Amino acid sequence: VKGLSIFYIFIALLMFGLLNQQHLYLNIIAIILALLVLVGLFKIEQKQNNPFLPTNEFNRSIMLAFITDLFIAMSLIGYNLYIPVYLQEQLGLSPLQSGFVILPLSVAWIILNFNLAKIEANFTRKALYISAFTVLLICSVIILFGMKVPLLIAFSVIFAGLSFGYVYTKNSVIVQEESSPRNMKKMMSFYALTKNLGSSVGSTIMGYM
């Protein structure tokens, strides 16, 4: 009960930090407090026999999965939300046309999922993660300087989709494989929450921009 209560305090502070639109300094303070509460939650749960948050499951690989998923979710909301809006409002494309521009991202994601086992057989996990984030960074730079060329955007999001697809899929597999059967459902729930928080943070950033 204590861990759950602290967790709700963390969520409340985080949501206030993301949603408040009155004073920016209040957002910053709330987010800092949320992070401090989260650290406190980990320390408290480590001392519990039956913890709400299974801290013993957070090994290096799972921590990496949670952190990368948070940032990937923040980035993905920019692709899915900002690019279509920009294409419609700034370039005058119809909703259907802007949808077709961003469609290759989803297609590439699906294709990668069907071929992930073959890819992993030839490369290490570290190499694939570094490649995925490098490709995503390059795609973002290309889109940044080619925002007035829809065909270039459509071409770039193909490779972005491959990056998003690998990181999302592999992170999910890591959490499932490296969590104990007893706590796997809890860990997958926290994993899903992390993705949702990343999307919320990304949406907030887009809103401020």
Language-model segments: which ranges?
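Hydrophobic transmembrane-helix bundles of small-molecule transporters
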Residues: 1-68
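12-transmembrane solute porter fold
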Residues: 51-209
